[in-house]
Amino acid sequence: MTIHTSEQNNVGTFTEWDPLEEVLLGDPLGAMKPGEMAVFDAVVPPEYEHVLDNIFPNGSRCYPSDLIDAARKEVTELRAILEGEGVKVHVAQPIDFTQPLKTPDWHVPNQFCSSNPRDSLLLIGDLIVESPMADRSRYFETFAYRDVLKELNERGARWISAPKPRLSDKSFVNDLKRDADGRPTQWLTTEEEILFDAADFMKFGKDILVSRSHTTNEAGIKWVRQILGADFTVHEVETKNAFAMHIDDTIMPLDEGRLVYSPDYFDPAALPDIFKTWEMFEAPEVIYSAKNRLGRLSGWLNINMLSLDEKRIIVESNQEHTIKFLKKLGMQPILCEFENYFPFVGSFHCASLDIKRRGQLRNCF
């Protein structure tokens, strides 16, 4: 499949760092505890299960209204920052996540939320792909972005959907094996059908990195390779994180030639040889402030940043170590409070989807 440039269609992106001109932001309004917890159970370490119990006390299925309000305030701040930097911003239109879902194979009492468009939409060049997500509670999540997708399609973007998965019990390991510390020793998803979350893919021009995880299987990776065709090389890299869900709290490119990685989740030796010319930086120590309701469960969200270009990058305002690190590298960190967003399973990179970055398809190595 030929992938057109953003200049041809006024839509598209090939890297994580080219100048950002247009973006879609999520919205946690109406967020619910997932009606199906199989994915959450696989990616949350047992010692942190009490954190979720604190967020959803007494069997509640709704996110607390004060937490939603605080997170939406931070999204408003993020939008103001982006627009102040000259970026056009779209925002999700939340749907009614209290509605149950039912197929011939399964039923869930409610859905999740539209906080993280990066999870469900893969945008490479002018091609937008709706992901076949493994979480049953997220089956229709892209409906929250439908108005934006229609607009982009009218502007020339090609909008497709991966094969809609059945998500029958055959798509999941029946009894997930774990070691003595409770760490999964196998992935939740089987190879029964094509499954992937878009946030398991990272763009480096003609080269794409992807990580097998609890939400992305080999069949999904193979399908993306087939769709992208000969113009792209999709490299599968191995994670050290037994609870892995997405790649963007594991590695994050800063510009064309430098990236930062989580030492707990990733060994840079796992990268393909083309990265030998790049500088690799171990992520600075994470700061877990009192306001962060996830605490250590938030992992390495300090590197889940959003680049505006090769200099400007949005970073959580409480992450002083990360801010100093970026300044030392000659970058211009833009600070934004975002810790109230963490319980909705993401930070800046997760909470956004690049719609247009100025730049051509190229070899970045």
Regions found by a protein language model. Give the residues of each.
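The feature marks the mature, well-folded catalytic cores of soluble enzymes
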Residues: 1-365
